C-alpha cells in the first residue's frame, strides 16, 4: 500500500492547465528518431527502439523508445510517476522506496547491506577501503572522510548500512533545499565530476529533444533559470545492481501536465558508483485505434559513465544497442504491471 502522501502528491501534480490538443505522430516526427510510427503495431505490443546519435560528450550515450499502454494518458503518467521496478528481478532493482518531503531518517529504515551476494560484498569492500583522501565511490571529500571514519569505527554490514543511510539523508536534504544547484560533486576518485552538469551536457547534445521538453526542464530547474523552478517532484531512493555492483541511487520524478498530454523527467541526481547519472524523459499522449483508447509513450534515456570515455565508433554504437534492449526490458515490465492492475 502506498503512503498517503503519494495520493495527495498525485492529485496536485495532475491539476491541468488549458493547452491545445496535439497530434502525437506529428510531434514525434519533429523531435524523435521515429519519423514514422504505426500505432496499430504499438497497440498490439511492439516497442520501437533506436540508439541515440553519437555524442561529442565523451561519457554519455542515449536511447529512444516508443510504446503504448492500455490506459489513458493521465493514468499512464500517474503510474510512471511512482512506478516501483523492484518487483521485477530481471531489472536488477534490489530496493526502491519513496522519500518524504522534508525527508526523515525513517525514510531509510529499510536500508540493509547484510548479504552474501557478490554485488553487496563489492560495495562493502569499497566502503571499508575508503579513506579521507581517496575512494572508488562517488563521494565528496567530506563524505569520504565521514564514511571512512564511520566504517572504521564499526565495519559490520549493519553499521555500514547506517553510515550510508546518514550520507543519503544529507544528500536528499540538500537537494530538497536547493534543487539541482545543490547537488554536490563527486571528488574522492581524484577528479571533480558534477552529475548535474553531466545531465545538462547530455541534454544539450540533443537540441530537438531539449526543445521539446523545454517547458518541463525549465520548471524543474534543469535548464534555464533555476530560480524559476516551480514543480515539486516525487523523491525516491533505490539500490540497484549495476555491472555486478550494488549501487545506491537518489532520484526525483517531475510531472508536467500540458493539456491533453504529459511530460515527465526521472533523474538520478546521485549514484554511489559505477556510473555518474541516469536520466529518463517521457512524453505521453492519448491515442485511439478504432474503438480502443490507449496512451502513446515516447521515452528517452541518457546515461553518463566513466567507462564510456574510453569507447569510440563501433564500441559506442554497441553500448547504445545494449542500452535499447535493457530499456525495452523495463518497458515490458511496466506494461505487465499495467495489465495486472487493469484486470
Feature names for model-found ranges:
Residues 21-75, 81, 85-343:
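Terminal "cap-and-tail" regions of soluble proteins that handle hydrophobic small molecules
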